[in-house]
């Protein structure tokens, strides 16, 4: 038991502590930035100064600091996060490391992401579940290519809150001029980011603890809050509940003949008993009669809650369908534009079939064309025929089924999909819907009947050849 928990138990008692803890909001955030900007040290300092470290953990850090530490005689707090042996020996982060802690105001899950360009896929994976990004900048080096790259990926993945932490201020004598110079440089770069992003910029020193949990006496020219205060007070619940109601059906719950409900997690918005809804892609309508949870029925439910909805009418709804309000305008298409983050050594192939999972629905899709690939260091684009490992590009997709979806920036759960290799069942990429295109319905005779039959035979008996389906290349 750490000191923070001991203090809260002594003040509130067990029942009071559990009740308070249960009703705290949860903030998921990631730390990112260039190599050696101090991401792991910052998390270690945050955990240490907020009294979240157990005594045996602190003792282990003291011992490990003598062997692989980088802070001299002082304990290397980065070792609280860098768990892999290779990370500790190299002094870098390779995998995404997750840490949990809580304060009296809020619960937190931290994703410590790697800074190296070859681990872009790891960083994208960490960002996909977060609400906020803490982007570190070394006060000595300023805004680097990797800073721009991580800002771009975080923005691409829909994060609407950035805290830019100008770290290592102790190494520039806590200079206000240097901080203002970096602040102006980053704000100028941020004009190229899409959507509305709330950006807070703060000077700190993770090694010394300045402006991490407590305000710094050495930077009295900075009048804003500390990092922990910013994390405790950022409003993320408004973002989740302000969107349109989206409910991807994960399971049809039929325990007996008298009950039929549709289970899932509300992706965005709010639903109330009595709301008129429609199911997509069928378009059938009904009315919500109950909102069932483990703790009993609710009059209304908002984004993030796992619920079971019962309806007034027996309409056909199955796993993968999307329930929305009757008045909602939702795109249903099999043809779309999506940004793709590629995560495997074998490049993305135009025309090859991949399994697609989007909001509980499974279908098959293929890339008709790569519109462009991003240079994620300077946000420019260039022509590409495919996407390599860690490549990010805008692709034109076709699916075998019509899918109800949103733009990723509007709703991540119904606008994001994963791409799976059909032979190995390995997740090879992630897609972020940019826009829907006109449905593809027709097919032209581009190949002879013999060519199509031979192609089907090869794909059936020699799947490891990964032959392209010719019958789909002729779709208009």
Curated annotation (Swiss-Prot):
Pfam short name (any one): GTP-eEF1A_C
Positions of region (G3): 112-115
Catalytic activity, reaction form: sulfate + ATP + H(+) = adenosine 5'-phosphosulfate + diphosphate
Broadest EC class assigned to this enzyme: transferase
Binding site for GTP: 33-40, 112-116, 167-170
Any one GO molecular-function label of the UniProt entry: GTPase activity
Chain residue ranges for the region called G2: 91-95
Pathway as given in its UniProt record: Sulfur metabolism; hydrogen sulfide biosynthesis; sulfite from sulfate: step 1/3
Coiled-coil ranges from the UniProt annotation: none
Span of the signal peptide: none
Keyword terms, alphabetized: ATP-binding, GTP-binding, Nucleotide-binding, Nucleotidyltransferase, Transferase
InterPro entries: CysN_GTP-bd (IPR041757), CysN_II (IPR044138), CysN_NoDQ_III (IPR044139), EFTu-like_2 (IPR004161), G_TR_CS (IPR031157), GTP-eEF1A_C (IPR054696), P-loop_NTPase (IPR027417), Small_GTP-bd (IPR005225)
Spans annotated as G4: 167-170
Annotated ranges, domain tr-type G: 24-240
Family matches, as PANTHER family: TRANSLATION FACTOR (PTHR23115)
Function of the protein: With CysD forms the ATP sulfurylase (ATPS) that catalyzes the adenylation of sulfate producing adenosine 5'-phosphosulfate (APS) and diphosphate, the first enzymatic step in sulfur assimilation pathway. APS synthesis involves the formation of a high-energy phosphoric-sulfuric acid anhydride bond driven by GTP hydrolysis by CysN coupled to ATP hydrolysis by CysD.
Assembly notes: Heterodimer composed of CysD, the smaller subunit, and CysN.
Protein name: Sulfate adenylyltransferase subunit 1
Species assigned in the record: Vibrio cholerae serotype O1 (strain ATCC 39541 / Classical Ogawa 395 / O395)
């Amino acid at each position: 038991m750490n000191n923070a928990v001991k203090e809260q138990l002594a003040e509130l008692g067990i029942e009071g502590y559990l009740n308070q803890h249960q009703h705290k909001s949860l903030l998921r955030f990631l730390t990112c930035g260039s190599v050696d900007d101090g991401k792991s040290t910052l998390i270690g300092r945050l955990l240490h100064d907020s009294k979240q470290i157990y005594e045996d953990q602190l003792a282990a850090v003291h011992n490990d600091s003598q062997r692989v530490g980088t802070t001299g005689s002082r304990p290397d707090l980065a070792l609280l996060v860098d768990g892999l042996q290779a990370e500790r020996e190299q002094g870098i982060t390779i995998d995404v490391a997750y840490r949990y802690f809580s304060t009296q105001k809020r619960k937190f899950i931290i994703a410590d992401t790697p800074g190296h360009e070859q681990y872009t896929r790891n960083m994208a994976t960490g960002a996909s579940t977060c609400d906020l990004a803490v982007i570190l900048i070394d006060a000595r080096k300023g805004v680097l290519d990797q800073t721009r790259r991580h800002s771009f990926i975080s923005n691409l993945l829909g994060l609407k809150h950035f805290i830019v932490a100008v770290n290592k201020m102790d190494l520039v004598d806590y200079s206000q001029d240097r901080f203002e110079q970096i602040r102006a440089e980053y704000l100028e770069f941020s004009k190229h980011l899409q959507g509305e992003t709330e950006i807070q910029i703060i000077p700190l020193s993770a090694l010394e603890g300045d402006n991490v949990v407590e305000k710094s006496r050495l930077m009295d020219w900075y009048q804003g809050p500390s990092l922990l205060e910013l994390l405790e007070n950022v409003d993320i619940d408004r973002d989740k509940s302000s969107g349109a109601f989206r409910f991807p059906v994960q399971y049809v719950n039929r325990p007996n003949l008298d009950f039929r409900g549709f289970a899932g997690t509300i992706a965005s918005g709010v639903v109330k008993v009595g709301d008129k809804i429609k199911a997509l892609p069928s378009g059938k309508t009904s009315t919500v009669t109950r909102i069932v949870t483990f703790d009993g029925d609710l009059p209304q439910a908002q984004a993030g809650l796992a619920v079971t909805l019962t309806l007034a009418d027996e309409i056909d709804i199955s796993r993968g369908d999307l329930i929305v309000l009757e008045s909602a305008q939702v795109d249903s298409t099999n043809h779309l534009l999506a940004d793709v983050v590629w995560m495997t050594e074998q490049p993305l192939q135009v025309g090859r079939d991949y399994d697609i999972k989007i909001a509980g629905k499974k279908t098959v899709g293929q890339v008709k064309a790569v519109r462009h690939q991003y240079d994620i260091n300077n946000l420019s684009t260039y022509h590409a025929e495919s996407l390599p490992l860690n490549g990010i590009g805008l692709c034109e997709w076709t699916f075998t089924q019509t899918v109800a979806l949103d733009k990723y920036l509007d709703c991540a759960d119904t606008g994001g999909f994963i791409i799976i290799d059909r032979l190995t069942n390995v997740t090879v990429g992630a897609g972020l819907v940019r826009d829907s295109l006109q449905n593809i319905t027709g097919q032209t005779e581009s190949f002879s009947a013999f060519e199509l039959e031979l192609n089907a035979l090869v794909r059936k008996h020699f799947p490891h050849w990964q032959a392209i389906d010719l019958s789909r290349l002729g779709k208009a």
